[in-house]
Amino acid sequence: IIASLHNKTSYFKEVSEDKFKSIYEDIKSNISYLSNYYNTLYEIGFNEVYASPSNYIFMRNYFKINAALEYANSELDNWYSLVTNETKIRVCLIHNNLELNHLLNNKLISWDNYMIDTPVIDIVKLYKNEWKNINFSEILERYIYKFPLLDYEKKLLFILISMPPQIKKSNNEFEKCKVISEVMDYVFKTEELIRPYNTKQEEEK
């Protein structure tokens, strides 16, 4: 359904030189913010005399979060190199609020946030909302088969989903453990989702 929507409504739109630069700087800023956020959490945890269970889970897995952010940062630079000379960007009608609850009888509902923009936004939002509930690898494979993403679109997609969410604050230790474990699950699942595409890209070089 999503691929069909994007296929039927996509076209190339001329953009100014600053368009890609603006996207690059916005994402760079978000990555920098997350890196500082997680570095601060690590330093606080490192200085704890007696590590709480939630802090133990975080400290033990911090390297994976850091690796995900380094990957996003490195790929963002590669993405910017790809689009530097582009004068057009592919856009289409996007739902802009994709989740399973907005799919009813094989139709998309709740169109309040629709807009014309890059198709990548719909895939990112669907993944962020439903990564725990569906086999996204299969969905992404089918989507790309029906609506092949351009190299710079695919790269942008993987950059955006590889950025881990912030850890929600809680005063309950059990809840903290649960939330941190969920962030780690997100990081591991996302790495697993992206890996085959990166491997294929390396083989094609």
Regions found by a protein language model. Name each.
Residues A3-H6, V49-N55, I65, E86, ...:
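Gram-positive cell-envelope targeting signals
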